[in-house]
Every structure is written in C-alpha cells, then in structure tokens.
Amino acid sequence: MKEIITKYPHLLHGGDYNPEQWIDCPKVLEEDIRLMKEAHVNCVSLGIFSWAKLEPEEGEFHFGWLRRIIDHLFENGIYTILATPTGAMPHWMTAKYEEVRQMGPDGVRNLPGRRHNFCYTSPVMRKKMKKINHELSRHLGNHPGVILWHISNEYGGNGS
C-alpha cells in the first residue's frame, strides 16, 4: 500500500492547538510544547479559528506569528496539520458585510460572534474564504513542518 503521507509514515498523535489565544505569552507556548513532547504528540492542527488573527483588518495579512509557531513545533519534532481558518469569521467582515452571516428560517440574519455563522451562498463570503485560504497556502503551504491540510472545520456544523 502506498504511503499517503510520505513526510511521516507513522501513526499521527495529537489534537487541535489554538495558541493564538496566548500569542503574547511565550512561556505558555514553551510549556505547551514541553507537555506535548511528554505526551509523545507528533502533530497538531493549527489555525482552525485564527482568521481574525491572520487578517485583523480587511486585506491586511499577518502570517509571521503562525510561521514562528510552526517553526518552533517543527524544531521540537511536532508536525502541523494546517487548517483553513474559516471556522470563525473576523469581526470586521461580519460588521461590514451583513450578507456573509447565516440567515435563519425566519429570514433574519444571525448576529455576529458565532462560530460557523457564514452563509454558503454569499458571493462575498466565498470570495473572502478563497482569499484567506489562498494567502495561507502561499505563505505557509510549503513549510517543511506542514504535513497535511485540514480543510474547513466541522463542515455543516453551522446548522445548514
């Protein structure tokens, strides 16, 4: 049987990791990696809910923080399963483009602030998702520590 993952042909052991929550606390990141190594973690899923941190303002992309984390994980023998960050939209998007928010059966759009609150049929939403995913792949897709891509989180988890 041909190996699907040629970079690491062993059982992957890890889970979701959301370090953007404590990006300004390097000691927490160091301790996390220490604990991961102690637990024999060899991969983590990164970026699932990081859109607001990756694109804090429309068209303004910040990938350096994520690259540094992927670098540090890789230096410690931990691969990254890089997620498309579309599980949660940034606030600027829901505030500027009402049509990107999901609409309930009553015809009323959901309020901002929910995960998976996007409207699949919104051309704006599709364009913005395509852009963030393209930029993410352009900046980090060839990183040696990226072993797999995690495409969308909990597809259909928004009640659609």
Question: Which residues are covered by each model-predicted region?
Answer:
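Aromatic-lined substrate-binding rim segments of carbohydrate-active enzymes
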Residues: 2, 29-110, 134-137, 141
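Boundary/entry segment of secreted carbohydrate-active catalytic domains
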Residues: 4-25
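Hydrophobic faces of well-ordered beta-strands that scaffold small-molecule active sites
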Residues: 11-16, 42-46, 80-83, 147-151
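Short, contiguous strand/loop micro-motifs
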Residues: 18-20, 55-57, 120
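Active-site beta-loop-alpha junctions enriched in small/polar residues
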Residues: 18-20, 49, 85-89, 151-156
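Flexible, glycine- and charge-enriched loops at secondary-structure boundaries
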Residues: 22, 59, 63, 122-126
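Polysaccharide-binding and catalytic clefts of secreted carbohydrate-active enzymes
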Residues: 106-160
